[in-house]
Structures are given as C-alpha cells and as structure tokens.
C-alpha cells in the first residue's frame, strides 16, 4: 500500500492518486464536544509540506465518497484504503467513547451513505493515545446499533503512538479487538529513525500468534529509506511522494517481490509468503 500523507483537501485526493497512491492518510480534528470537525493537520508537520490545507470533515467525506464509489464521475479505482489519523490529543480521556460514536455516525451518513452504495474504501481508525481505546468500542457499537454490522468488515485499527508492542496488545484486548490491525511506526521526514521497532512489529506479524496483521512505516520520501523499509518487510509505506515509492517498486530487486495492492487484496489478512 502506497499511502499518501496529509491528504486533507478534496483536491489532494486526485493529486496523490495520480502520483501512484492507492491509499491516503487524512487528519481529523475534534471540537470540545468530541465532534469530528476539520480535516486539518496544522504546524508543525513534515518538512517541505504545506500543512494548512483543510476542509470541514463532512465535506471531505462527501468528496472521499465520490472518489471511492464506482460509477461516480470522480471515481478513482486505485484508491482502496483510507487512514483517518484521529487527533484525539485535544480530548479528555473520558470523551474517547463519545468521539467514536460521533465519528461512526458521520461516516455512516456521509461516507457509507447509510449502507446504500456508499464509498467502498477500507477505513483504518488510527489513534495516537492508548488511553483512548474506548473510541473503538464507541465506533463499533454505533455501527451495530444503527443496523450496519456488515460495515465492520471495512474497518481496521491502528495505535500510532510508537508505544511498546506489548502495551499496544493490551489496549486492543481492552477494546475487544482481535483482528484488522495495522501497526504504524513513524517519525517526521525531518528526522531519521532506525527500523528496530519496525522489525519487531514485522516479527509479531509473522509469528502467527501476534496481534498485528499489517505493518506500515512513515514518513518515507527518499529512495534509500524506501528500500530499507521494503527490505524490513513492511506492507505499507506512507509518503509525501508516492511517485518515489512507485519508482523503487519498479526496480529489479523489488519488482518480483512486491506489487501495489488492489481492492481485491484484503488489508486485514496477514500476507503469507
């Protein structure tokens, strides 16, 4: 999965997909009542990026729905996965469940069109704080209560705080999650970070008894760091430059080992070599 980083304006969806992304990451900020409010990152963000583009969350969802609904004039067949980077740092811990409920209602109505031919992309809820695990239950309970448990098939989870793998496993246990898990390992492109934790996550994924289904690494903007991440065995790379990742995937050393995921590839299944 080539994951376009900080895609917060509707116009950027086309831009990143045209550069080779089959997945995007979108920031979601919340108001003081735990309602999802804007797709906005703000300063600081990655070096060389404009971090100030934004939409109202509900407007973005409509644009995203168009881009991922077959038959729509704006449809992009390649776009199959969306990571919502939930900026829950502004919330109190006891608001997490509420935030999950409200997020689910927004997506149900404006993205999934109440289950009636809505957007088809797989969705990952990425949460920065392990203490906010109740957000997951708020979200999943709401989908069930609203009569759409089938949409849980489209839903995955990620804790993005670079916590110890064991602590993340415990948070999932508390949240009642036993699958559909992506594990991120991340640092801004302005700094360098080793691949130790990535390798640990890959080992957990491949052990057959870990909690991780997929591992992604960000932010990767250079050819050398792309090769390092691929050599470590990641499933996804988040980038500001999807064309760089595409170029490396076309190199002889990687062409036979990796391909770009399509809608038919299940993002919740651990890939068996």
From Swiss-Prot:
Q: Where is it predominantly found?
A: secreted
Tell me where the transmembrane regions lie.
none
* Needed cofactors: Mg(2+)
Task: Tell me which CDD domains the record gives.
Answer: GDPD_like_SMaseD_PLD
One GO molecular function term? Answer: lyase activity
How the cofactor is bound: the record states:
Binds 1 Mg(2+) ion per subunit.
Which Enzyme Commission number(s) are on file for it? 4.6.1.-
UniProt cross-references to SUPFAM superfamilies, sorted A to Z = PLC-like phosphodiesterases
Q: Which UniProt keywords apply?
A: Cytolysis, Dermonecrotic toxin, Disulfide bond, Hemolysis, Lipid degradation, Lipid metabolism, Lyase, Magnesium, Metal-binding, Secreted, Toxin
What this protein catalyses is: an N-(acyl)-sphingosylphosphocholine = an N-(acyl)-sphingosyl-1,3-cyclic phosphate + choline; an N-(acyl)-sphingosylphosphoethanolamine = an N-(acyl)-sphingosyl-1,3-cyclic phosphate + ethanolamine; a 1-acyl-sn-glycero-3-phosphocholine = a 1-acyl-sn-glycero-2,3-cyclic phosphate + choline; a 1-acyl-sn-glycero-3-phosphoethanolamine = a 1-acyl-sn-glycero-2,3-cyclic phosphate + ethanolamine
Q: Give residues annotated as binding Mg(2+).
A: 25, 27, 85
Keyword Lyase assigned to the entry: answer is yes
> One GO cellular component from the entry?
extracellular region
* SS bonds (residue pairs): 45-51, 47-190
Described by its record, this protein's role is as follows: Dermonecrotic toxins cleave the phosphodiester linkage between the phosphate and headgroup of certain phospholipids (sphingolipid and lysolipid substrates), forming an alcohol (often choline) and a cyclic phosphate. This toxin acts on sphingomyelin (SM). It may also act on ceramide phosphoethanolamine (CPE), lysophosphatidylcholine (LPC) and lysophosphatidylethanolamine (LPE), but not on lysophosphatidylserine (LPS), and lysophosphatidylglycerol (LPG). It acts by transphosphatidylation, releasing exclusively cyclic phosphate products as second products.
In the record, the note on similarity to other proteins reads:
Belongs to the arthropod phospholipase D family. Class II subfamily.
Write the protein's name: Dermonecrotic toxin LspaSicTox-alphaIA1iii
Which lineage ranks, top first, belong to the organism behind this chain? Eukaryota, Metazoa, Ecdysozoa, Arthropoda, Chelicerata
